[in-house]
């Protein structure tokens, strides 16, 4: 069985949230490792936007209601620029993932001038 979620984020929206809320926004949405990774780039905004889109895509793939994910930091994307991205799910969100019987995931993130997008696929390994 597969479950797919996708999301698209306007990069400027993330830039505005950063300007308005600064570290408070970062600490509420991203893990320390995600923030560190994104800030290694000349412009961290597209990378933050891609990770934000990934988190939203996870929520859609799990078919969760907005209030069911208490902490966006429970959804973490680890990986390098061109290497494989690894989705790490913690806490309550991981519980939903396991309860639905999923055993693995695949993630793809893309950036364009004004938008970042993510697609997440959850799957169950055949027995």
From Swiss-Prot:
Keywords assigned: Cytoplasm, Fatty acid biosynthesis, Fatty acid metabolism, Lipid biosynthesis, Lipid metabolism, Magnesium, Metal-binding, Transferase
Compartment annotation: Cytoplasm
HAMAP family membership: AcpS (MF_00101)
CC cofactor: Mg(2+)
NCBIfam families per UniProt: acpS (TIGR00516), pantethn_trn (TIGR00556)
Protein name per the record: Holo-[acyl-carrier-protein] synthase
SUPFAM superfamilies per UniProt: 4'-phosphopantetheinyl transferase
Binding-site residues for Mg(2+), renumbered to this chain: 7, 56
Function: Transfers the 4'-phosphopantetheine moiety from coenzyme A to a Ser of acyl-carrier-protein.
Family affiliation: Belongs to the P-Pant transferase superfamily. AcpS family.
An example molecular function term from Gene Ontology annotations: magnesium ion binding
EC number assigned by the record: 2.7.8.7
GO process terms (BP): fatty acid biosynthetic process
Reaction(s) catalysed (UniProt annotation): apo-[ACP] + CoA = holo-[ACP] + adenosine 3',5'-bisphosphate + H(+)
GO cellular component terms listed in the entry, alphabetical order: cytoplasm
Gene, per the UniProt record: acpS
Segments crossing the lipid bilayer: none
């Amino acid at each position: 069985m597969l479950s797919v979620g996708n999301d698209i984020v306007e990069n400027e929206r993330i830039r505005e949230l950063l300007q308005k809320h600064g570290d408070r926004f970062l600490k509420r949405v991203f893990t320390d490792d995600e923030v560190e990774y994104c800030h290694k780039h000349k412009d961290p905004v597209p990378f933050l936007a891609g990770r934000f889109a990934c988190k939203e895509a996870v929520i859609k793939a799990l078919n969760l209601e907005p209030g069911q994910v208490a902490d966006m930091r429970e959804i973490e994307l680890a990986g390098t620029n061109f290497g494989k991205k690894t989705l790490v799910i913690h806490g309550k969100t991981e519980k939903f993932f396991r309860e639905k019987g999923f055993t693995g995931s695949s993630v793809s993130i893309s950036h364009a001038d004004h938008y970042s997008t993510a697609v997440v696929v959850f799957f169950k390994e055949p027995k």
